[in-house]
């Protein structure tokens, strides 16, 4: 052992993402113009009706919608447990956009699940199939969706490698917190891979102008990482056809919720259907 790492917190408040205190405060409020565009779409979107949408880097998404540029959603899940209330909020939003000619990518975070020592490969592959059935039942057109395991989509890994060149240690510490980086450093690999997921719809193999993540606000840390690393790496990303810095579109959960509600933590989660006992 050659070094002992010490750090000093210079500002108060939880970082965005997995250690957020009040998840409903993450991101920026959506503008009136976005609500007008969504109101002109076919069908109804609850967070648009009650004007509760929040965003990260929302202007490129707004401009792409106004100019009718090609758009793809990146929205998936970690297969760590049963379908829950947060999933249905997100899946209904994906279904709404699909019905209005926005296509969807659905990354399955098997890389992150594989790092979870509580889950065997057999268990998380079971939850992949179980969750996909529920997403389909919630209205997502799986036949029209690019569903993939992170570990099998080489283009995601290529993009993650490109953006990782712009990574500095202070960035994930600021986003995810020093405690997370000290106690669970391999998580950073999963975080950078998710950046590749969010950028993937713009890859030259698919040729889309803009991509955006649809999620709960607990994923804001990944969106911050995506925006910052994409900005730092845009010139290199252009070699892969990437044109814009991705956006994030957040569906608020229950107001005032403390911590991260997740299928990884059954005691904090509102399940729909069979729940964690299969």
Task: State each model region's role.
Residues 7-10, 80, 155-159, 168-278:
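Active-site cores that bind ATP or allylic diphosphates and position pyrophosphate for catalysis
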Residues 44-113, 213-215:
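N-terminal catalytic cores of NTP/NDP-binding nucleotidyl/phosphoryl-transfer enzymes
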Residues 58-62, 91-102, 127-132, 186-202:
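Structured alpha-helical segments in the cores of large, soluble enzyme domains
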Residues 77, 107-112, 145-157:
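Short, glycine/charge-rich beta-strand/loop segments that flank catalytic centers
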Residues 85-89, 119-127:
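Alpha-helix N-cap and loop-to-helix initiation/capping positions
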Residues 107-122, 251-254:
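Short connector loops at secondary-structure junctions
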Residues 123-149:
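A glycine-rich helix N-cap at a beta->alpha junction
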């Amino acid at each position: 052992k050659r070094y002992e790492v010490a750090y000093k917190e210079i500002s108060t408040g939880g970082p965005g993402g997995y250690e957020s205190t009040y998840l409903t405060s993450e991101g920026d409020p959506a503008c009136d113009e976005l609500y007008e565009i969504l109101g002109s779409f076919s069908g109804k979107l609850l967070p648009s009706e009650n004007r509760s949408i929040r965003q990260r880097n929302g202007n490129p998404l707004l401009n792409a919608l106004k100019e009718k540029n090609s758009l793809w959603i990146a929205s998936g899940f970690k297969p760590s447990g049963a379908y829950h209330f947060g999933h249905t909020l997100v899946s209904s939003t994906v279904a709404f956009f699909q019905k209005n000619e926005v296509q969807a990518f659905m990354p399955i975070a098997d890389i992150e699940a594989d790092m979870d020592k509580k889950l065997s490969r057999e268990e998380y592959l079971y939850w992949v199939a179980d969750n996909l059935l529920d997403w389909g039942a919630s209205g997502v057109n799986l036949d029209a969706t690019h569903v993939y395991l992170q570990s099998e989509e080489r283009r995601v890994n290529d993009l993650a490698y490109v953006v990782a060149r712009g990574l500095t240690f202070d960035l994930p510490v600021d986003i995810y917190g020093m405690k997370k980086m000290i106690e669970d450093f391999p998580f950073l690999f999963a975080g950078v891979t998710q950046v590749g997921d969010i950028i993937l719809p713009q890859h030259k193999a698919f040729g889309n102008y803009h991509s955006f993540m649809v999620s709960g606000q607990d994923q804001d840390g990944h969106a911050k990482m995506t925006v910052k690393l994409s900005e730092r790496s845009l010139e290199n990303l252009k070699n892969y056809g990437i044109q814009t810095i991705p956006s994030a579109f957040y569906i608020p959960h229950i107001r005032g919720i403390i911590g991260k509600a997740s299928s990884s933590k059954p005691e904090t989660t509102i399940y729909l259907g069979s729940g964690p006992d299969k």
